[in-house]
Amino acid sequence: MVQDGTGIDAAGMLAGRLVIEVTDTPAAAFAAALAGDFGAEVVVCEPPPHGSGLRRLGPPAVHAAWWPIIARNKRSLAIDHDHPGALPVLQRLAARADLVARDACAAGSRVLEAAGDSGTAVDMHLFATGADRPDLWAWSTRPEFAAAASGMMALTGEPDGPAVQPEMPLADYCAGMMALSIALAELRAGRRRLCA
């Protein structure tokens, strides 16, 4: 058992907190998985019939290994965000949420819209490098760009050799970890605002 300075079991520091995950990219999903590691209840909102796009990330050979890693400590809610009956469900869920982990997918915005003015969740909104300016950097949302721009690719490969793309989305993992750190500070301070 790992304890922080207060004597609280670190694995349960987020016990009683609700995290809603609405994402198609690894960064926000990894942040939500870390929140689950610390005891938060994490609910992944997935569109039927195939679920989150993260279930199919990468080549078919890695699907079976990838999803259990990113979906650990989470529960899944199959919900069609465009269905009229989804709004009351999202409103109830959003009213209880402490944190919404989302990316540029439209469904994440619908969860926050459902919360309306009564929403009190910290909004952890992550998006790929360059997604805010696709007119300038149409290719910059690719994970290879993020790994190169962040310096992650320079840390891999042979000395004096070319850079090597890591097997895992290392830049996404770092972004998710940093975003969750900011969100935890916001939760600790009791502030509810856009934090990443």
Question: Language-model features: where?
Answer:
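N-terminal helix-loop segment corresponding to the beta1-alpha1 unit
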Residues: 1-194
